Amino acid sequence: MPFHLPKSCLIVFCNLLSFHIVAQPNEHQSALIFEKRQIASESFESVNVLDIDKDGVLDIFSGSFWYKGPDYIRRNYVGPISRHGEYYDDFSTIVFDVNGDGNKDVITGGWFGGVLVWKENPGKEGNWKEHIVARCGNIETTRSWDIDGDGVVEIVPNTPGKPLVIYKLRKGQTNDVVKFDSIKVMDQHGHGLGYGDINGDGRGDLIVDKGWLECPDAPFSKPWVLHPDFDLVQASVPMLVTDVNQDGLNDVIIGQGHNYGLNWYEQQVDKKKNRTWIKHSIDPYNAQFHTMMMSDIDNDGALELITGKRYRAHDDNDPGAHDPVGLYYFKWNGESFSKQIISYGPPGEGKGTGIFFAIEDLNNDKWKDIVVAGKDGLCVFFNKGVAR
């Protein structure tokens, strides 16, 4: 006799099947294998990689310490960072030889102190001297982009409720005195910041919570025009500008930094040059997508989206704060993003991204590795390549 499932069973079965499909590679891709290695248990939320001692090997810098490569066991103290509740006041790790002495320095800043600083690499073991770049107000996090195309990055902190300011290293300085010029491009902006060419004129624009700021032909002397295309709340830093569907128009990928959701906004331009945006969901089921990167981590020539949860971004106060912690990469399959899980589980088992992370080939095996900090510790996910 025919067998009929109750409707409730059908619903459960279909839901499980859908999740299974989303988590698997499509027919044109194979999953990557990652080996997780715990580096430290401190709860600094930012990390980057650089060759600190100029021995040709990449080291890891996070918070008050740097870890010597290639094994990252030996660590060196950099200096103190103030702590406020669960937070260390250290929300970026931008690598930049600020004073031109050949040693890679680090730029950071924090919410509580409201100060953008650069930490001077002594070139050897010992404390890194801290220099003030600007007192700019509460810093959510900071990013760097080469806005004028001169080969030197500018520094752009996200300071919600405060002016949006670009900090440019002043040229022709000696090592003893280093100053940054400040260029205000907006009187006030909110949570979220991105950079990329929206209108196809070859210049990078700034993306903020209320729209995008069009870069003029003289970015440090002419006004930036706001196009109020968006109305975002607690958007990610960065918001990524990339041509997702390869139609010749750049789109924007935006995470919800303190809520559920990861989306991409498809740019469309009609014959009258009117610009509209169509919102597409990438992952509506996870929360606190505070930071993200694009990188080719499977060596197929196409960029993947790498992101995950900023664990305890607002302590216990965000939607999804008590959900499992995850790190993922998403691959465009021609129609949508396919999700691959790198790490997922309860705190201590799953691992998130923190607020600033790095992707580099640490062990010279031609596969890019992922280095993530956070309130759930400092880890490296060594990329072992495609599963066979």
What are these regions (language model features)?
Residues 1-26:
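Bacterial Sec-dependent N-terminal signal peptides
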